[in-house]
């Protein structure tokens, strides 16, 4: 996932007193503990065009209800966007994080064809609180239509059990970042667990430093292609402690 935070905040910013629709590339809404982004960062990859709108239905404290509807064509294998709900917090070292408890209830429906997308958490790490992103940790709750994670080999490097689920772990570069992707064995539309478990595994088993700073905790969907797709999030909450 990519986006320009400064640009996003300088454009459309609203509050969630009523349902709000975000349709421009960098539209966002700030309320409670969240920023919700439409975030069409890869729309230029859609050679044959497309569109996407994200609707924020309610935000209250650490819980948000939202949906996103999209249609993208062209640019096979290229991510077009990452509509997401991002937790607002001050960057902190991994060693200072006790838990990242989260609940995510969602469903993905479509009447079109060729739907290729994921539904995933996204966390970014850096060696300093204000530094550029050096590591990305993705947790895929769904891989729709054959969507696959970034990988140097095309095969998992490990199959750890975290939060009672055995995940396929992939590793590969995205520009200057190293991307760790935990992929669930099947779509998980009702998730509840501690996201810190994924970080703990990487620090204990994959050599990730506990001195790294956690910059972002986000949850959303990356579409590659398809039409008439709707991701509906009936409940999303996350609490960093």
UniProtKB/Swiss-Prot annotation:
Keywords: Carbohydrate metabolism, Cell wall biogenesis/degradation, Glycosidase, Hydrolase, Polysaccharide degradation, Secreted, Signal
Biological process annotations from GO: cell wall organization; polysaccharide catabolic process
Pfam families in the record: Glyco_hydro_12
Signal sequence range: 1-18
Superkingdom in the source lineage: Eukaryota
E.C. number(s) listed in UniProt: 3.2.1.151
Entry GO CC: extracellular region
Subcellular location: Secreted
Predominant place of localization: secreted
Entry function: Catalyzes endohydrolysis of 1,4-beta-D-glucosidic linkages in xyloglucan with retention of the beta-configuration of the glycosyl residues. Specific for xyloglucan and does not hydrolyze other cell wall components.
Name of the protein: Probable xyloglucan-specific endo-beta-1,4-glucanase A
């Amino acid at each position: 996932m990519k986006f320009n935070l400064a640009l996003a905040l300088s454009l459309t910013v609203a509050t969630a007193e009523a349902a709000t629709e975000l349709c421009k590339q960098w539209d966002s809404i700030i309320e409670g503990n969240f920023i919700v982004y439409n975030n069409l960062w890869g729309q230029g990859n859609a050679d044959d065009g497309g569109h996407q709108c994200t609707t924020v239905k309610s935000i209250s404290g650490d819980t948000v209800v939202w949906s996103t509807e999209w249609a993208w064509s062209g640019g096979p294998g290229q991510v077009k966007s990452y509509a997401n709900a991002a937790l607002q917090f001050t960057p902190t070292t991994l060693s200072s994080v006790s838990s990242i408890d989260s609940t995510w209830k969602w469903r993905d429906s479509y009447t079109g064809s060729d739907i290729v997308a994921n539904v995933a958490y996204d966390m970014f790490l850096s060696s300093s609180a204000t530094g550029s992103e050096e590591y990305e940790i993705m947790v895929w709750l769904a891989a729709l239509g054959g969507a696959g994670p970034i990988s140097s080999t095309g095969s998992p490097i490990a199959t750890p059990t975290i939060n009672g689920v055995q995940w396929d772990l992939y590793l590969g570069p995205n520009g200057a970042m190293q991307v760790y992707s935990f992929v669930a064995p099947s779509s998980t539309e009702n998730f509840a667990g501690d996201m810190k478990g994924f970080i703990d595994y990487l620090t204990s088993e994959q050599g990730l430093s506990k001195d790294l700073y956690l910059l972002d905790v986000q949850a959303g969907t990356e579409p590659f292609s398809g039409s008439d797709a709707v991701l509906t999030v009936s409940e999303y909450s996350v609490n960093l402690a």
